Amino acid sequence: MSSIEERVKKIVAEQLGVKEEEVKNEASFVEDLGADSLDTVELVMALEEEFETEIPDEEAEKITTVQLAIDYINANLA
């Protein structure tokens, strides 16, 4: 089983159509990886599906970087 970090990065790369090497922890979905608002919604849905969790809208709005997504999943899967 790959780590949460690896799984999040793979999902981000697939959802945003970028290479996994471009998906750095500090990367912003919008500013660095070219996501728009629809992309970010679809990204959150993909994370919810992968990790079998529900991310409330008010929390999803705060997840703007790869690291924030990793941190959220780590904190809420325990």
UniProtKB/Swiss-Prot annotation:
It is found in: Cytoplasm. Pathway: Lipid metabolism; fatty acid biosynthesis. Keywords: Cytoplasm, Fatty acid biosynthesis, Fatty acid metabolism, Lipid biosynthesis, Lipid metabolism, Phosphopantetheine, Phosphoprotein. It comes from the Bacteria. One of its GO terms (cellular component) is membrane. Residues 2-77 form the Carrier domain. The modification O-(pantetheine 4'-phosphoryl)serine is found at S37. InterPro entries: ACP, ACP-like_sf, PP-bd_ACP, Ppantetheine_attach_site. NCBIfam families: acyl_carrier, PRK00982.1-2, PRK00982.1-3, PRK00982.1-4, PRK00982.1-5. Belongs to the acyl carrier protein (ACP) family. This is Acyl carrier protein. The lineage of its organism: Bacteria, Pseudomonadati, Pseudomonadota, Gammaproteobacteria, Cellvibrionales.
